[in-house]
Amino acid sequence: PNIQTKIIEQIWKEHIFQGTVVK
């Protein structure tokens, strides 16, 4: 049940990391 949440959190972290790196 928490698998989807973990995946979303990972994607969110990756997205933020990429955005920070790009900026």
Curated annotation (Swiss-Prot):
In the record, biological process GO terms are: catabolic process
Q: What is its EC number?
A: 1.2.1.28
Reactions catalysed, semicolon-separated, are: benzaldehyde + NAD(+) + H2O = benzoate + NADH + 2 H(+)
Q: Which domain of life is it from?
A: Bacteria
Which EC class, in a word?
Answer: oxidoreductase
Sorted keywords for this record are: Aromatic hydrocarbons catabolism, NAD, Oxidoreductase
> What would be an example GO MF term here?
benzaldehyde dehydrogenase (NAD+) activity
Q: Where are the transmembrane segments?
A: none
The reply to whether Ribonucleoprotein figures as a keyword in the UniProt entry is: no
Q: Spell out the subunit comment.
A: Homotetramer.
By sequence similarity, the record places it as follows: Belongs to the aldehyde dehydrogenase family.
Protein name in UniProt? Benzaldehyde dehydrogenase [NAD(+)] I
Which species does this protein come from? Acinetobacter guillouiae
